[in-house]
């Protein structure tokens, strides 16, 4: 008698898990990853604030776009990935032997890995950006605030 309801419940649970819906067991991992992301963003911000390198000072003139939304959903981290790719292009990190730019590249690689892990299989989201732009330090401050908001909603 309850077999159909049980099967429906199992099917719904599998559909939610397959589509990346957070489960109670994944919340702890998500919190750790968001905390790591937050730490890497803060470390990257400290390196970017260092103006002793010509490439870094060039980066401070580049304009970045922020997403239109004020939500704290993990799917919006895709927008961070898109803008980090542009930051990497601006810095032209590949041939650089400078210690600061190598460290920035390492932090960015770590950020990308964490964001991809947090996103899971969700790839259908399209970022919508504000028309106004921000400079590099403000860009990173806003993403740090975004990650702090996500972390506080998970705790």
Curated annotation (Swiss-Prot):
UniProt xrefs under SUPFAM superfamilies: 4-helical cytokines
Subcellular localization, as worded in the UniProt entry: Secreted
Keyword annotations: Adaptive immunity, Cytokine, Disulfide bond, Glycoprotein, Growth factor, Immunity, Secreted, Signal
Any one GO BP annotation for this protein: adaptive immune response
Statement: the UniProt record of this protein carries the keyword Transmembrane: no
Signal sequence range: 1-20
Alphabetized GO MF terms: cytokine activity; growth factor activity; interleukin-2 receptor binding
Pfam families assigned to the protein according to its UniProt record, in alphabetical order: IL2
InterPro entries with a match to the protein in the record: 4_helix_cytokine-like_core (IPR009079), IL-2 (IPR000779), IL-2_CS (IPR030477)
Glycosites: 23
GO cellular component, one term: extracellular space
S-S bonds: 79-127
Function according to Swiss-Prot or TrEMBL: Cytokine produced by activated CD4-positive helper T-cells and to a lesser extend activated CD8-positive T-cells and natural killer (NK) cells that plays pivotal roles in the immune response and tolerance. Binds to a receptor complex composed of either the high-affinity trimeric IL-2R (IL2RA/CD25, IL2RB/CD122 and IL2RG/CD132) or the low-affinity dimeric IL-2R (IL2RB and IL2RG). Interaction with the receptor leads to oligomerization and conformation changes in the IL-2R subunits resulting in downstream signaling starting with phosphorylation of JAK1 and JAK3.
Entry's family note: Belongs to the IL-2 family.
Listed name of the protein: Interleukin-2
Species the sequence originates in: Capra hircus (Goat)
Chain's gene name: IL2
